[in-house]
């Protein structure tokens, strides 16, 4: 890994400034919740005057080294580690596991961080945790991963998948035990992690977002537009939304926009055609941040049927856009959606319940609809990125979370 000039920072005193190394198995240009959180966290820390370094897979195998990159409008040093494409997945790249520790040693020698913040325990995070612990560097770990989330890309036979999940949680436990503090995005995710490992005292710390970056138009809509934002993969259960659409009154003329891309796109486009929905369902593929926000602003509601969300930044983005949320009653989504207040929950995979919930929103009076919009806007304030940054700064310094 070669060196590169460190971006200049301002407005901090030397005693307050920290050199932070964030270890990620997924980072820009990847589009997913874990990568987006790491980007916002890193940019927010740079804005506060800290010296932030990222260790992440290279964008292409030969494009390795240390580069000054602009992330969320802020410059920081990103140490790109030689990686390979995992072809069963539509974008995933990975560092060879047996090379993780040597690469970690090299980056640690170069950066000399005050603290490590791991965003994954699988490859890069594992290497950093093992080598960082040897050097007695303070480690904070955030878990974004459920082994269940990666089952579809392992190519394992069905009967081996249960063993893989058990093995995955054991490996997570071995790495997370090296951290002085372990966090997850929500209380439900923290409880789940504690049940699945021997970790205790896991702290719920929201991924956070800056609500002012999103535009909410409060008021009834002229068109009935459903939107989903996220990876187009199996665990997102987008097919449930398509089946629910067939149960809606055709007079409502409901359209559905899927913002994002993934390995299930062709299958879902085929399903939409088979269900007679091809003219009302639009898959955008990858879009810019500006386009994503426009789709949210113009929608009537946000629908998410996913069964494996540890928080869901996309749902928070929809809330910041003033949308009622219809979400599966699974994992951490009930943490964001308060049934009957800023949206409705439905039994996971139950397209009939989902259709009923969507109908309820479409049939609301303008006043009822606006009340639900304002409830989303109010609820998302608890997830302000500055609160998240405050907590992590404290954890980096060893200050207990309030």
Task: Kindly give the residue locations of the regions a language model identified.
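A conserved mid-protein helix/loop that constitutes part of the nucleotide-sugar donor-binding site
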Residues: 36, 224-247, 252, 256, ...
């Amino acid at each position: 890994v070669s060196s590169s000039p460190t971006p200049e920072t301002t407005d901090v005193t030397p005693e307050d400034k920290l050199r932070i190394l964030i270890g990620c198995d997924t980072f820009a240009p990847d589009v997913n919740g874990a990568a987006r959180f790491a980007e916002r966290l890193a940019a927010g820390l740079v804005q506060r005057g800290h010296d932030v370094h990222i260790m992440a897979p290279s964008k292409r195998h030969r494009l390795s080294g240390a580069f000054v990159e602009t992330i969320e409008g802020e410059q920081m040093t990103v140490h790109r580690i030689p990686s390979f494409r995992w072809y069963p997945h539509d974008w995933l790249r990975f560092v060879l596991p047996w090379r993780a520790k040597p690469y970690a040693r090299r980056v640690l020698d170069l950066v000399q961080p005050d603290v490590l913040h791991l965003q994954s325990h699988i490859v890069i995070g594992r290497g950093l945790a093992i080598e960082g612990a040897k050097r007695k560097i303070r480690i904070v770990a955030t878990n974004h991963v459920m082994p269940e989330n990666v089952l579809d890309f392992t190519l394992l036979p069905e009967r081996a998948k249960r063993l893989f999940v058990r093995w995955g949680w054991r490996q997570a436990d071995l790495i997370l035990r090296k951290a002085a503090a372990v966090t997850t995005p929500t209380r439900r995710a923290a409880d789940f992690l504690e049940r699945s490992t021997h970790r205790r005292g896991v702290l719920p710390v929201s991924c956070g977002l800056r609500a002012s970056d999103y535009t909410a138009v409060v008021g009834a809509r002229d068109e009935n537009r459903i939107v989903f934002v996220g990876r187009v993969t199996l665990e997102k259960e987008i097919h449930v939304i398509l089946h629910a659409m067939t149960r809606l009154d055709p007079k409502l003329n409901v359209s559905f926009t899927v913002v994002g891309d993934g390995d299930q796109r062709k299958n879902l486009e085929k399903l939409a055609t088979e269900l007679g929905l091809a003219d009302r369902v639009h898959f955008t593929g990858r879009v810019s941040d500006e386009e994503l926000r426009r789709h949210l602003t113009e929608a009537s509601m946000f629908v998410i049927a996913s069964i494996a969300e540890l928080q869901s930044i996309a749902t928070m983005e929809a809330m910041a856009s003033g949308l009622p949320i219809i979400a599966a009653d699974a994992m951490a989504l009930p943490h964001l959606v308060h049934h009957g207040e800023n949206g409705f929950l439905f039994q996971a995979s139950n397209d009939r319940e989902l259709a009923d919930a969507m109908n309820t929103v479409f049939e609301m009076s303008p006043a009822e609809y606006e009340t639900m919009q304002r409830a989303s806007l109010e609820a998302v304030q608890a997830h302000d990125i500055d609160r998240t940054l405050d907590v992590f700064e404290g954890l980096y310094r060893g200050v207990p979370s309030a």
